[in-house]
C-alpha cells in the first residue's frame, strides 16, 4: 500500500510542473500590455511604466519570470496585485467561500446521485427508473442560470424557505440554494453513471455466486455490487471538485457570492496576471489533491489495484 501511495505521489510531480508551466505561458502570451492598461486613456510615463515592470519582474525574460513564479508558489508568496493588495489575502477571502460551496454541492450530488442511481439501477426498466432518467435529462438540459432563477423564485420568493441571495456572512442556509444549482448538472451525471454501473454489476457472475451462497441481500449490495459500482463514480466525483470550484462563476454571480469565480473574472478583466496565475495554480492543486484522494479510494474499493 505504501508503494502504491508513493507511486501516485511521484506521478503528481510532473503533472504539477506541466500544468503550472502551461498556465504561466498562456498568461504570459495574453495579448495587450497590463502595465500600459493601468494608465487608461492618459497613459503612463516611461519612467512610471518601467518602475512597475521592474517591481513585478515584467522586464525579466520568460524563463526568469517562471522561476520567480515557482519560487513564490513554494514559499506561498504570490506577490501583490497592481493595487498593492497581497494576492494571498485576495485568495484567502475567496477560496474558503467557494470551497465550502463546492464541497456542499459535491455532497448533494454524491448522496442523492448515488442513492437515486442505485435504486434506478436495481429496478431498471421500472417506473422509478424511467422517472429518474427523465429527471436527470432535465437537469442536464436546463442551463445553470435558468435553474438558479427558477429556484430563487420557487424556494426564495414563493415559499420563502431559503435566502434568495447569499448574505455578507455566508452561512449554511445561504449556500443551500447555490449548492443545489452548482451541483445540478453533476447530480444528473452521477445518477446516470451509478445507474449504469449498478445495472451491469447486478447481473454479474460474482453477484449470482454470492446470492447462490446464501448471502443476505444487504451484504450482496454493499460488499459486492456497490463496492465495484462506485469505482467509476468515484472517478467522476473526485475530478468534479476542481471543476465545481473553477466553474462556479455563474452560480456565484446569480447568488451574489464573492468567491473564486468572481475574483478570477475580475482579475482577467482588470488585466492582473499575478492574481490570474495564482488563483489558477491553486485550482490546479485542488485538482491534483482530489485526484490523488480518488486514487487512494480506488485501493480501498478494489484491493487488486494496489498490486498493479
Predicted regions, residues:
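Residue-level recognition of pore/gate-forming positions within transmembrane alpha-helices
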Residues: 12, 20, 42-43, 137, ...
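An internal, D/E-rich "acidic patch" concept
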Residues: 59-114
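Hydrophobic alpha-helical transmembrane segments of membrane transport/permease proteins
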Residues: 15-67, 159-177
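Membrane-interfacial helix-loop-helix junctions in multi-pass membrane proteins
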Residues: 53-62, 77-88, 168-171, 182, ...
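Small-residue-rich alpha-helical segments with characteristic i,i+4
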Residues: 15, 123-124, 128-138, 142-144
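Membrane-water interface segments at the C-terminal ends of transmembrane alpha-helices
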Residues: 22-29, 71-72, 134-163, 181-185
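Alpha-helical transmembrane segments of integral membrane proteins
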Residues: 2-4, 93-128, 144, 168-308
Amino acid at each position: 500500500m505504501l508503494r502504491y501511495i508513493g507511486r501516485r505521489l511521484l506521478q503528481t510531480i510532473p503533472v504539477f510542473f506541466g500544468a503550472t508551466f502551461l498556465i504561466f505561458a498562456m498568461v504570459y502570451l495574453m495579448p495587450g500590455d497590463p502595465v500600459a492598461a493601468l494608465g487608461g486613456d492618459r497613459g503612463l510615463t516611461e519612467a512610471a511604466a518601467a518602475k512597475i515592470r521592474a517591481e513585478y519582474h515584467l522586464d525579466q525574460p520568460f524563463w526568469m519570470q517562471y522561476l520567480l513564479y515557482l519560487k513564490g508558489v513554494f514559499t506561498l508568496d504570490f506577490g501583490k496585485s497592481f493595487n498593492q493588495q497581497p494576492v494571498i489575502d485576495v485568495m484567502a477571502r475567496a477560496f474558503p467561500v467557494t470551497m465550502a460551496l463546492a464541497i456542499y454541492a459535491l455532497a448533494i450530488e454524491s448522496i442523492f446521485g448515488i442513492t437515486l442511481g442505485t435504486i434506478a439501477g436495481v429496478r431498471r426498466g421500472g417506473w422509478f427508473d424511467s422517472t429518474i432518467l427523465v429527471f436527470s435529462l432535465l437537469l442536464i438540459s436546463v442551463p445553470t442560470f435558468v435553474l438558479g432563477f427558477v429556484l430563487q423564485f420557487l424556494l426564495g420568493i414563493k415559499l420563502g424557505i431559503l435566502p434568495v441571495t447569499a448574505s455578507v456572512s455566508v452561512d449554511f442556509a445561504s449556500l443551500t440554494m447555490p449548492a443545489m444549482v452548482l451541483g445540478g448538472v453533476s447530480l444528473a451525471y452521477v445518477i446516470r453513471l451509478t445507474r449504469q454501473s449498478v445495472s451491469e454489476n447486478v447481473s454479474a457472475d460474482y453477484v449470482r455466486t454470492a446470492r447462490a451462497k446464501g448471502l443476505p441481500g444487504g451484504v450482496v449490495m454493499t460488499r459486492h455490487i456497490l463496492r465495484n459500482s462506485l469505482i467509476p463514480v468515484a472517478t467522476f466525483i473526485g475530478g468534479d471538485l476542481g471543476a465545481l470550484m473553477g466553474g462556479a462563476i455563474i452560480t456565484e454571480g446569480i447568488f451574489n457570492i464573492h468567491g473564486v469565480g468572481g475574483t478570477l473574472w475580475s482579475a482577467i478583466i482588470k488585466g492582473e496576471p499575478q492574481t490570474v496565475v495564482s488563483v489558477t495554480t491553486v485550482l490546479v492543486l485542488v485538482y491534483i489533491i482530489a485526484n490523488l484522494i480518488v486514487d487512494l479510494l480506488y485501493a480501498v474499493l478494489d484491493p487488486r489495484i494496489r498490486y498493479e
